[in-house]
Amino acid sequence: MAAAETLNSQPTLGASSGTAAQLSQSEIDALRARISSCWSPPAGVNASSKIYVVLRVLFKQDASMSREPVLVEATASPLGPALAESAKRALLLCQPFTMLKPEHYDQWKDLELKFDPQELLGG
């Protein structure tokens, strides 16, 4: 997933930006791999697509989501709504996220995750 300089210091899919949450690189990599395995890009989105969405995800202690992800940021694109829905669907399908360590719950209970097809699809 990727880092966004404008995010509120929460880890994103691929890297962390800021210092609020400090997931290990192995946790980030495992989260990225898990979500990528559940994600089906919408029609018209590929590795060269220059669009992304950021979703805020709240987790319960069992590493499942406590509610539906909320769209925080998106590039202006006609494909944006479809990308946001596909990202939400991937998160719903992938839970629980057992790679997130219970002892670090305070660090991952509230994350903003960036879905960037260029990074998810290796563009």
PLM region descriptions:
Residues S49-V53:
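Short, small/polar residue-rich loop motifs at catalytic or cofactor-binding pockets
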Residues A21-D29, P78-E85:
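Soluble non-cytosolic domains of exported or imported proteins
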Residues D29-A33, S37:
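Internal, well-ordered alpha-helical scaffold/interface segments
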Residues S17, Q22-E27, P41-S48:
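Long, low-complexity, Ser/Thr/Pro- and Asp/Glu-rich intrinsically disordered
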Residues M1-S17, S36-S40, R56-T75, E85-G123:
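Conserved "boundary/linchpin" sites in short secondary-structure elements
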